[in-house]
Amino acid sequence: MSEKKRLHLIIADAELETVPEQILDHPAIVNYAKRRKRKPEKIILDSTYHHAALKQLEDGERRGRPDIVHICLLNALDSILNKEDRLRVYVHTRNDYVIYIKPETRLPRNYNRFIGLMESLFEKGAVPEDLELLRLERKTLQELINEINPDAVFVMHEEGELMIPKNFGKLLDKFKKPAVIIGGFPHGDFRSRVEGVKISLYKEPLMAWTIVNEVIVSYEWEVIKKFSTKFI
């Protein structure tokens, strides 16, 4: 049986990480960990609570943004494309971890519960351990792309070729296994070496979750109108 046509969406260089060793003793980290009754090294770095500590880190102004991953995943997993089994989503982090996400996964809407889930994932390597709806592996972005083995790679980039979303959907539809890479950081450029056709969907920079929505919806109609009977 031939493989089903799917979009492979990668949130790359995501600012999702546990607290780095060099700031474990910072008061902002220690106090937050005490309130949560967790060890400092087990908590997820979050600029909302750890802003003072981030000033001591390289790239501190862009780090500690698990909220970006949270919103992107909520939107992607609840999309029609995912419900029709035409989407696979991955998260690649700044420290070269990859989160594999089963399409049936339903993430917590509540942000604090999501943070708790991510902390469990980084500690255990899979959650829940018996089902592995989320699985964490050490892997570079390029290793992930090689593993997916797409027939086309597109990188969403503000310096890319300007293309309206509808036309980008038509372009994606020309391939059976396209991969789209979206930066999971608030500003700046990719840290990882990223190869692919650079595409921009708007004349101004957009947040990652907006790009996720535009990419999915642009591809959604092109694919679903051909394969689904639910909309006829």
From Swiss-Prot:
Matches recorded under Pfam families: EMG1
Keyword Amino-acid biosynthesis in record: no
InterPro entries per UniProt: Alpha/beta_knot_MTases, Rbsml_bgen_MeTrfase_EMG1/NEP1, Ribosome_NEP1_arc, tRNA_m1G_MTases_N
Site feature (Stabilizes Arg-65) residues: D67
Signal peptide, first to last residue: none
Residues with site note (Interaction with substrate rRNA): R65, R106, R109, R113
Annotated keywords: Methyltransferase, Ribosome biogenesis, RNA-binding, rRNA processing, rRNA-binding, S-adenosyl-L-methionine, Transferase
First-tier enzyme category under EC: transferase
Single GO MF descriptor: rRNA binding
E.C. number: 2.1.1.-
Domain of life according to the entry: Archaea
Residues given in the record as S-adenosyl-L-methionine binding sites: G183, G188, L201, Y202, K203, E204, P205, L206
Keyword Ubl conjugation: no
Gene3D superfamilies for the chain: 3.40.1280.10
Reactions accelerated catalytically: a pseudouridine in rRNA + S-adenosyl-L-methionine = an N(1)-methylpseudouridine in rRNA + S-adenosyl-L-homocysteine + H(+)
Gene Ontology terms: biological process: rRNA base methylation
NCBIfam families named among the record's database cross-references: PRK04171.1-5, PRK04171.2-2
Biological function: Methyltransferase involved in ribosomal biogenesis. Specifically catalyzes the N1-methylation of the pseudouridine corresponding to position 914 in M.jannaschii 16S rRNA.
Family: Belongs to the class IV-like SAM-binding methyltransferase superfamily. RNA methyltransferase NEP1 family.
Assembly information from the UniProt record: Homodimer.
Protein name as annotated: Ribosomal RNA small subunit methyltransferase Nep1
Source species: Pyrococcus abyssi (strain GE5 / Orsay)
